[in-house]
Amino acid sequence: MPDESYFPEMLTPRDVAAVLSRAYTRWDGAAYAALLDRFALPARKPVRSLSRGMRMKLSLAAALAHRPRLLVLDEPTGGLDPVARDGILDILNDFTRDETHAVLLSSHILSDLEKICDYVALLRRGKLLFCEEKDRLTESCAVVRLPERELDILPEHAVLGLRRNGYAAEALVRRDALPPSVTAERTTLEEIVLLLSKHETERE
């Protein structure tokens, strides 16, 4: 599913159903109608009159109504307000409660990925920096904050990413490679991505 609605702007959600029900043999009209109700989408208003958030919800309703096992989504919550984003994430969580279903999505909103993803991958300029189980990644990494002049207490092989500001530094480290004397803090997916990306930029 792309990050923009692909439906002609003169169509209504009801028209969308009429077209797609002929294209998909597994189309579930009742499920589509239920999703329109859940998303508070007016069935008779043309697409051109819908907000960006409503268009995204319409695209998601159409994608789910033909009962797929795999959803591929590009920035599904991009540009949406927090309430609309939570609504999209709730639907995706409901979808993946069935263990035969999966969602593959790309997003720059890392807090969304942290909420719903089991596995995460980071691509930077075509290079795969990591592909890991999310919980294992956040548990195996940590952040050390210290004066920049004290960076040499960190074993070189333990440092995965680094950010300096001239006085202090933040280092993304492998927790199991730290000496006992070094205090490390729990980290988040967002910190991991930011520190790894910063480190890669400085190496280029």
Each predicted region: which residue ranges?
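Short, surface-exposed beta-edge/turn micro-motifs
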Residues: 59, 140-141, 168
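C-terminal coupling/interaction segments
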Residues: 160-204
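Short secondary-structure boundary/capping segments
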Residues: 39, 94, 134-136, 161-163
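Conserved beta-strand-loop-alpha-helix hinge in the C-terminal portion
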Residues: 127-150, 155
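Alpha-helix N-cap/helix-start and coil->helix boundary motif
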Residues: 14, 110, 151, 189-190
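Short loop/turn segments at beta->alpha junctions
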Residues: 12, 133, 185-188
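Short, surface-exposed beta-strand/loop "edge" segments at domain boundaries and coil↔beta transitions
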Residues: 71-76, 150-154, 177-181
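ABC transporter nucleotide-binding domains
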Residues: 1-111, 115-124, 129-130
